[in-house]
């Protein structure tokens, strides 16, 4: 029996199990051993579910039978398992979810085995994953660097081969930012593509800006995962256009010559775009031009206006306040200032000043901004290429605000100190368009740099076809973080 490298993607792992080259038990036990060896260094998996995984692995059936995955510890829950949203009070309560989210149900139906839950900043309200409840997640490429956020645990886990794929959610870049700084592929699909239900929270609370997303190390895994988890369910607020065929079937096809716009500067001008981030985007653009696409410097004019962030920040304040209230309902007592981080409580105080009419006005402004962004695609452009983040990967602690920091005049605790991380991602949460971060660049100090590609609403098919083209032209699969030991193999039986 041959050995298997845990760096192989989910598609390859599934084929090895299916062909009998390795058993699902061998795959799972090797993955668990790898998590136990590596996770103490990076703190990506905060709630291991190894015994549950062993039970479910024996019963798994479907195209990915026996392949492990990880779930972000935020809003999308698994029955019987601890759920904290990285809230101190929730962790102390020992609360366990009483149902499986639709995402979890669909992953199980495809044969995936839930291995554990990953770290997130408290309620996902930061762009670095350093919650008080669980501690910081560290970047496998450099343990002193951030993994981004808010799906930082999932991004780091996939980068370190703790699982081939993982779940995340994205309200301002929370999948794409960790994908960029951890060197993996991260997809935020079209609004309504993946159901957040049956307990719908972020989908409504962030006015449709929060979307369930996916992490993998290959584009083909992202396509296959999207086929597994896509689809409207009862109670969903939004519904994406139905795909004409499975995404996994279409990614190898040539999409023809497309009109591609490129943005490699900050159109607002309030800070300078990091030169290495810009260079990575230009490299991707050059590769697409060489493949026959019509590539030009062009972008939606709306990206030069960030005034919408004031309204978005108000909506985020209200969303956090409601999440604190809802989590208190789950444990049978109100969560207080002592149960949450100080920045979250500041957001609650701000939310208490928001009237119903003011909130409705903020939603209206976001809808107006979304239309301005989307009209660029309506004018005949197919794709936009731009850096995922606009700065180098921050150090651990760099983006955390010291308690008592004066927030007066800042847009919110959610935005403060983090604009350069999310400036190029949050517009597409508001517009609801699909966007993917690809690990195309490397910085001079050895850190990954992601390049973002954005398609028109509902056009994940086109997005994934072009992502696959770039994966072929600028292969990244051989890159592995220093932490990952390539010799860690599944032992022969």
From Swiss-Prot:
Hydrolase keyword on record: yes
Temperature-related behavior of activity: Optimum temperature is 33 degrees Celsius. Loses 50% and 100% of activity after 10 minutes of heating at 45 degrees Celsius and 50 degrees Celsius, respectively.
Regulation: Strongly inhibited by 1 uM diisopropylphosphofluoridate and 10 uM p-chloromercuribenzoate but scarcely inhibited by 100 mM EDTA in vitro.
Pathway participation: Xenobiotic degradation; nylon-6 oligomer degradation
Keywords: Hydrolase, Nylon degradation, Plasmid
GO molecular function terms noted in the UniProt entry: 6-aminohexanoate-cyclic-dimer hydrolase activity
Pfam families associated with the record: Amidase
SUPFAM superfamilies: Amidase signature (AS) enzymes
Membrane-crossing segments per the record: none
Superkingdom, taxonomy of origin: Bacteria
pH dependence text: Optimum pH is 7.3. Is stable from pH 5.5 to 8.5.
InterPro entries: Amidase, Amidase_CS, Amidase_dom, AS_sf
Biological process, per Gene Ontology: nylon catabolic process
Catalysed reaction, written as an equation: 1,8-diazacyclotetradecane-2,9-dione + H2O = N-(6-aminohexanoyl)-6-aminohexanoate
Active site residues per record: 72, 150, 174
Entry's EC annotation: 3.5.2.12
The protein's enzyme class: hydrolase
Family affiliation: Belongs to the amidase family.
Function in brief: Specifically catalyzes the hydrolysis of 6-aminohexanoic acid cyclic dimer (1,8-diazacyclotetradecane-2,9-dione) to form the linear dimer 6-aminohexanoyl-6-aminohexanoic acid. Is inactive on 6-aminohexanoic acid oligomers (degree of polymerization 2 to 6), various other cyclic amides, cyclic diamides, linear amides, oligopeptides, and casein. Allows the bacterium to grow on a medium containing 6-aminohexanoic acid cyclic dimer as the sole carbon and nitrogen sources.
Quaternary structure note: Homodimer.
Identification of the protein by name: 6-aminohexanoate-cyclic-dimer hydrolase
Organism annotation: Paenarthrobacter ureafaciens
């Amino acid at each position: 029996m041959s050995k298997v490298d845990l760096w192989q993607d989910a598609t390859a792992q599934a084929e090895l199990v299916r062909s009998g080259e390795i058993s699902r038990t061998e795959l799972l036990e090797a993955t668990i051993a790898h998590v136990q060896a590596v996770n103490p260094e990076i703190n990506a998996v905060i709630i291991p579910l190894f015994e549950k995984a062993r039970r479910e692995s024996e019963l798994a059936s479907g195209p990915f039978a026996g392949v492990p995955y990880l779930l972000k510890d935020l809003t999308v829950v698994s029955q019987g398992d601890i759920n904290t949203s990285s809230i101190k009070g929730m962790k102390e309560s020992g609360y366990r979810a009483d149902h499986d989210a639709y995402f979890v149900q669909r992953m199980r139906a495809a044969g995936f085995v839930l291995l554990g839950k990953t770290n997130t900043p408290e309620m996902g309200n930061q762009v670095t994953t350093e919650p008080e409840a669980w501690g910081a997640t560290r970047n496998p490429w450099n343990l002193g660097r951030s993994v981004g956020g808010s799906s930082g645990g999932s991004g780091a886990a996939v980068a370190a081969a703790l699982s081939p794929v993982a779940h995340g959610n994205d309200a301002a870049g929370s999948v794409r930012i960790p994908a960029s700084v951890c060197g993996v592929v991260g997809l935020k699909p079209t609004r309504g593509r993946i159901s957040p239900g049956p307990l719908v929270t972020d989908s409504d609370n962030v006015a449709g800006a929060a979307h369930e997303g996916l992490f993998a190390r290959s584009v083909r895994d992202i396509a296959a995962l999207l086929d597994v988890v896509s689809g409207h369910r009862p109670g969903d607020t939004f519904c994406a256009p139905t795909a004409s065929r499975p995404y996994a079937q279409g990614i190898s096809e040539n999409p023809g010559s497309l009109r591609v716009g490129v943005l490699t500067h900050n159109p607002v001008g309030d800070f300078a775009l990091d030169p290495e981030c810009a260079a990575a985007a230009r490299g991707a653009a050059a590769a697409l031009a060489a493949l026959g696409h019509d590539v030009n410097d062009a972008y939606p004019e709306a990206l030069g206006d960030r005034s919408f962030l004031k309204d978005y920040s108000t909506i985020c304040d209200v969303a956090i306040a409601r999440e604190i209230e809802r989590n208190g309902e789950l444990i049978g007592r109100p969560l207080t200032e002592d149960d949450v981080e100080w920045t979250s409580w500041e957001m609650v105080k701000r939310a208490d000043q928001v009237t119903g009419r003011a909130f409705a006005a903020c939603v209206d402004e976001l809808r107006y901004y979304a239309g301005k962004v989307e009209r660029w695609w309506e004018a005949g452009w197919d794709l936009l290429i731009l850096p995922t983040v606009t700065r180098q990967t921050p150090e651990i602690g760099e983006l955390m605000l010291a308690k008592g920091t004066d927030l007066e005049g800042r847009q919110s605790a959610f935005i403060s100190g983090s604009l350069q991380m999310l400036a190029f991602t949050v517009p597409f949460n508001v517009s609801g368009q699909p966007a993917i971060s690809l690990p195309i660049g490397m910085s001079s100090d050895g850190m990954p740099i992601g390049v973002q590609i954005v398609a028109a609403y509902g056009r994940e098919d086109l997005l994934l076809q072009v992502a696959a083209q770039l994966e072929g032209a600028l292969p990244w699969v051989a890159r592995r973080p220093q932490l990952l030991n390539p010799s860690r193999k599944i032992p022969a039986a």
